[in-house]
Amino acid sequence: MSDAEWRVIEPALPPPAWKSGKGGRPAEHCRRDIVDAIRYLVKEGIQWRAMPCDFPPFGTVYDVLDRWEKSGATERMHDELRRQCRIAAGRRPEPTAAIIDSQSVKAAETVSKDSRGFDAGKKVAGRKRHIAVDTIGLLLTVLVTAAGVQDRDGARPLLWNLRKAFRTVQQAWADSGYAGKLVTWAKTRLKLKLQIVPRTELHKFIVLPRRWVVERTFAWITRSRRTVRDYERLPAHHETIVYWSMIIIMSRRLARNNQSHQLHPT
């Protein structure tokens, strides 16, 4: 992680417990080293026990990742960087529209049987990640379920979380797999207009309006090797890994943007 990226991430990190009056002793390891280790794990897809000796012990890094996930710190950090990216792109800090979709990924042997399933359509045994993104492809929320969960069933808690976190979102786009009662449910329960973008021709590649944005986000996420397959015992940990994959992308984008402004001030 470059110095420019650290300057972007550091203000968004949760304050240390010993500084916020919650007690405890000062941390033994530098927070930048902890963040570097998490980013390395997510980007390179290594096993926890294969953490290089240049980083803090893997147990320490795992404890921090788990603590930030349970406290919501990772999601808050991600949300702050997303707001900065939207402002840098000339958008409002909070989105008004979203696109939803799902992606099934194979599960490693570390994934318990009760949290995995089989996606008959994609012929994938593992888990399914349901995501909502804004109109420029930045992640809004993610939900991980067993791969056997139907898109419509997974979309309900996803849209519920979306509405709870973003009161500004008024419309969402989805493919034909989400058609049916979900559209009515979203309108009556969430006051959200869910618009279905149908595929015009089967067995032919066509760039669908709005739909390509979420597909590009999936491509961004899978640049991080830890997300290509699900290795996490807990679905919540895989959700955290997805957030971290986007944190890496957004921090690099913001760092480049800041450096560009320094070189060419307006």
What spans do the regions from the language model cover?
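Short alpha-helical elements
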Residues: 1-266
